[in-house]
Amino acid sequence: MCYSTKKWVVRQIRKPKTTVILLVIAIGLIMITLSHGNDIIQGIGISLLSSGLVSAVSTFFSISEDSKKTVNDWGLEHVYMTRGEMNSSCDEYLSRSKNLKAIGFGFRSLRDSQEGRIISMLRKGGNVKLITMKPDCPALKLREEDERQKISDSISELLEWAKELNGMNLPGKIEVRWHEHLPSDFVFILDNRLFNGPYEYGKLSQQTISFEYNITGTAYEYHEAYFDQLWNDKSYCANALE
């Protein structure tokens, strides 16, 4: 048997469907020999049963290793059913971070519950970069319909909040840029953690599934590069605090 044929046979044997078929045939043959006493058929049945079990175990560990590699490569740490569940971990890493980059809308939870941490970040010379939407752009109306609440007011409050904190003349500063395109995901990038999740139809932002990634994975690198690309693209977003 040539090498390529052997590889094909191995791939077929390792398929879950093939494994199940082998196990069923093996059990059937063993049951027949138990009732008729045919040692040859019994030997074949036991051989197939052994092959099926080995294939099942091999497939299980192969899938486990592949999954583990994917998780490690992307740096996935946690999956949260809601953004609200994610907030406690996000708050913890925010308190240790010197800088913040984020894409969203009004960042109400950041302003309401984390203002002290943001001020502390600014006192240490850290910077906050936020990308949001223009309050009066037509695309924002679509998201307001999805969430069934007034987002434009929250964005206007965000701008006033940023101006107020910048007025404290701390070493760091808050920068806000806006655009006219609906973001598909919330993105929150800290010094050593990435948090993100989708904006879903008919759900408030705090009620959608969210993900946490460490700094060593591809996801962190990908999202930070994407943020920087948007931030530096003057045709995409402009200074919202001028």
Q: PLM ranges: what are they?
A:
Residues N196, E200-E242:
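Signature of lipid phosphatidyltransferase scaffolds
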Residues M1-I25:
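Juxtamembrane interface helix immediately N-terminal to a transmembrane segment
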Residues I30-N38:
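Juxtamembrane "helix-exit" motif on the non-cytosolic side of transmembrane helices
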Residues I174-F211:
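HKD (HxKxxxxD) catalytic microenvironment of the phospholipase D
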Residues F60-L142, E224, D228-C237:
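PLD-like (HKD) phosphodiesterase/transphosphatidyltransferase domain
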Residues L76-R83, V176-E180, I215:
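Short acidic-hydrophobic, aromatic-tinged amphipathic segments that line or gate anion-handling sites
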Residues L140-D185:
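HKD-type phospholipase D/PLD-like phosphodiesterase module
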Residues D39-T70:
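Transmembrane alpha-helices and immediately adjacent membrane-cytoplasm interface residues
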